[in-house]
Amino acid sequence: MVVDFKIKRAPAYRVASVSWKGPWNERRIRAQFDRVAKWARKTGLRTGKWIFREPGTRAWEVSIEVRGSAHSEGPIRMRMLPATSVASVVFDPNVVSPAVVYHGVTDWLRWRKRDKTIRSVGAYREVYDGDPWREPKVWAHTEVQVVVRK
């Protein structure tokens, strides 16, 4: 499998999201994604990309892109993730270790900063085309995006 890094323009996403602080817990991440997906189904919204972010130290956010009219309700907040330039890499976690991919993209971005292709690096996020736990094809097409400033 080829793992290739590229800089591209990511579209704006209108998302329903839940955020919290605490230690890394994959079971909690999955439960929060399920909570947002259940809310979207109950509200009658069509869903798109599933986005997982770490906006701060030990701070986590799960978001699902929604299409349709909705308002925040309880812990679920409606947000707009703006269109931005990102460094992107698509890979299959069953073939290539995510630790290797994250290390590789970090080094690749360090060199892009040195050769002045980019000015700064922002937050990392994982973007899926659907539910990565229930759909193996979605899991095999994991995309890691890193917000960059040119």
Tell where the protein language model's regions lie, with residue ranges.
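A solvent-exposed interaction/effector surface
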Residues: M1-K150
